[in-house]
Design a protein with these regions (language model features):
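Substrate-binding/catalytic cleft of secreted carbohydrate-active enzymes
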Residues: 204, 330-333, 340-586, 590-594, ...
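Secreted/periplasmic carbohydrate-active enzymes, especially glycoside hydrolases
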Residues: 1-345, 355, 360-363, 393, ...
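Oxidoreductase and adenylate-handling cofactor-binding alpha/beta cores
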Residues: 599-600
Length: 684
């Protein structure tokens, strides 16, 4: 009886969602199918087995894996009802999934509609011929089990499973702009030549025409941010692919954080005077290049690219994120002052790209062809299933995200191991396929740059992409010298290809601390004091700031995240190299180091504020600030004033704590405004 009641709830919710949305007068209707779902393990195959009610997005691993090195990679069945109203007759119906992790088999009224392999790109299936008026059954069989024909086959992150991104029902006329062409918008704004004087573009539209008729035409309109029409074109439709060249005079360029200016491009399909369909895309016009000696240039001006690698992973949610999660991450990205982000190691959800467009954050985004880093095996297999899936996911990524101006770099792979006669075994040679993937990117989109992230000798991969980037990690104590020597050598041996930093960093637990005075000491394995992460980043950044030839610098990583293979720091199953904690509630010391260097807003921050209990009276006080100087007080006693150094750091050495509480206070001024920070350390 309980199961029957739940099924009735599914029907009622489905009727409410579909009916209310379909009342809209727009030619295309999109209905969010977030509520009314239930799921169960496929192994629970009893006819009336109860479903666990859920709301999308959802993953079955959101809570289970916390603090462990185990999580479930299995198959689940998601179900809900779809109510088809009389008004939907003679319409076309599509199911649009933004992401199902990783394999999805879709059934409507128990008939197979289609399958999709790949957990991080959208897919769209037409269900017009599978439904009838009234109640319809929708089932999605979802598996995150390991398969060699689904990328990734390895990686230092969890494959969560589930319908972990939103799902929609799209309703159109018989003739429409295609939603099934690689689940893309069906509208692609190609930037043929962009300058400050004019923007020459070609708008390519892919149509789906069930009834080819005379009088079909496509109207394309480009409007600026104020809604003013700046270009338009009308073309008679003679087939399912339409190309329309347009020119904008004196365009306002999308210029990163300085001016993330967006235009809207609307494509309308008409039959005579009757509007059949409309798709609107926001985009921005810009041009860019990377120089092996001078770094990256946006619209002809040098732009220092720095930021983080980011995974889609939030405590208690896994990869099933909501809008507030993207908003929170962007708030932190803006606070620290990043100019770019690397979206690791797979295509991310649409809200992240949209937010980066709007906030001027440049993006590297990539397909999930990734190796295991320092763990066993590699990330590439020379077999038909693997390679076909890589090509498919690449096409989906490019077509789905084509119009985002924030995307400047297409990523090919991350840490693919290769036989080097020394450390690595004789794996399948990935180089021929890497070159093929690079060529496919260039065929689909010659306007952007391609890049790879390697942890093995770059000479194996030179010529496989436009840009070289390294994932490189050095020790706590000498990261500046090691980074300087390594990247100078990488530059000198890159055959004049631009070299960048795709990953660097160190782990940190906010619950583990050690005095920086003992940084030469050997730390216990897995012990990740917050202070040492910050010191390590200081050295890296001091080296990188002196090397403008590096086309980008990406920290690993934005936030702590789940990785089932990890046993380090204070929690098993966590990669703790983040600048913020897994729940985004605590910004680590390293976050404030970069804020002091990247964000021009005046700030002052005392490090080791969570190192509250000391057993050694001798210590130091480390401060990050972009103020010219600051004054230190301990228990209101003035210790002294110092000026910041070139990486916006002040260190007071030889500080002696008194038994009991020691209130640490620093003060500094910017103009007439005084900035203060305090914390309390107790000597026991």
């Amino acid at each position: 009886m309980k199961h029957n009641l739940f099924a009735l709830c599914l029907v009622a919710i489905g009727m409410l969602c579909n009916t209310s949305a379909f009342g809209d007068n727009h030619p295309r209707t999109s209905v969010l199918l977030d509520k009314g779902w239930g799921y169960k393990p496929l192994t629970d195959n009893k006819k009336n087995a109860p479903l666990i009610p859920v709301t999308l997005p959802h993953t079955w691993n959101a809570d289970y894996v916390e603090g462990t090195t185990h999580y479930n990679r299995e198959m689940m069945v998601y179900k809900r009802q779809l109510e088809m109203t009389p008004e939907m007759k003679d319409k076309r119906l599509f199911l649009y999934f933004e992401g199902v992790n990783s394999a999805a088999d879709v059934f409507v009224n128990y008939q197979t509609v289609g399958q999709h392999l790949g957990g991080y790109t959208a897919f769209c299936l037409e269900i017009t011929d599978f439904v009838h008026e009234g109640d319809n059954s929708l089932e999605v069989w979802v598996s995150n089990a390991y398969r060699t024909d689904i990328l990734p086959i390895s990686g230092d992150f969890n494959i969560y499973g589930g319908i972990h991104r939103p799902c929609h029902l799209i309703i159109t006329e018989k003739n429409c702009i295609s939603p099934v062409f690689y689940a893309s918008p069906g509208v692609f704004v190609r930037q043929d030549k962009i300058t400050e004087k004019q923007a020459d573009i070609t708008v390519e539209s892919v149509l789906s025409l069930k009834e080819m008729k005379e009088g079909l035409k496509l109207k394309t309109t480009v409007m600026d941010a104020d809604g003013k029409v700046v270009a338009r074109e009308e073309t008679a439709v003679s087939g399912e692919s339409v190309k329309q060249p347009l020119r904008l005079l004196n365009p306002t360029l999308w210029n990163g954080k300085k001016n993330p200016y967006l235009y809207s491009v609307s494509v309308e399909l008409y039959e005579g005077d009757r509007l059949l369909d409309k798709v609107t895309q926001q985009t921005g016009f810009r041009y860019f290049h990377a120089d092996p000696d001078k770094g990256f240039f946006l619209n002809g001006e040098y732009l220092n690219l720095y930021g983080f690698c980011r995974h889609e992973d939030v405590k208690g949610k896994g990869s099933a994120l909501h809008q507030e999660d993207y908003d929170k991450d962007m708030e932190l990205i803006k606070e620290v002052g990043a100019t770019a982000m690397r979206l690791a190691h797979y295509p991310h959800a649409e809200p992240m790209y949209k937010s980066c467009d709007e906030n001027g954050i440049l993006l590297w985004t990539e397909i999930p062809m990734c190796g295991p880093g320092g763990y066993a095996y590699t990330g590439y297999l020379h077999n038909k299933g693997f390679e076909e899936n890589a090509r498919q996911v690449l096409k989906e990524l490019v077509y789905q995200k084509f119009n985002h101006p924030s995307i400047c770099f297409w990523g090919i792979f991350n840490e693919l191991l290769i036989s080097d006669g020394k450390r690595f075994q004789a794996y399948d040679n990935p180089v021929p396929f890497v070159k093929e993937i690079n060529a496919l990117y260039k065929e689909l989109d010659p306007s952007r740059l391609t890049a790879f992230a390697t942890c093995v000798d770059q000479t194996h991969y030179l010529g496989c992409a436009d840009l070289v980037a390294w994932n490189k990690y050095f020790g706590w104590t000498n990261s500046k010298q090691q980074a300087a020597e390594f990247f100078d050598h990488a530059r000198s041996t890159s055959n004049n290809q631009p070299v960048g930093v795709s990953e660097y960093g160190a782990g940190a637990s906010i619950h583990q601390h050690a005095s920086p005075l003992n940084k030469e000491a050997q730390l216990p394995k897995g012990f990740h004091p917050e202070e040492y992460q910050a010191i390590c980043h200081e050295g890296y950044w001091e080296a990188f700031a002196e090397r403008p030839y590096l086309w980008a610098k990406f920290i690993w990583q934005f936030s702590d995240m789940q990785s089932s293979i990890r046993k380090e720091g204070d929690t098993d199953g966590i990669n703790d190299k983040g600048a913020v904690t897994y729940d985004r509630k605590v910004k680590k010391d390293a976050f404030y180091f970069y804020k002091a260097n990247w964000n021009p807003e005046p700030m002052l921050y005392i490090c080791s504020r969570r190192f509250t209990e000391h057993t050694d009276a001798q210590t130091l006080v480390r401060v990050y600030t972009n103020l010219n100087e600051a004054t230190l007080y301990i228990n209101d006693k003035k210790i002294g004033k110092q000026k910041k150094d070139k990486v916006n750091r002040i260190v007071w050495d030889n500080i002696t704590l008194l038994p009991g509480e020691n209130v640490i206070r620093v003060e500094g001024k910017s103009g007439k405004k005084t900035f203060t920070d305090t914390c309390t350390w107790t000597l026991k």
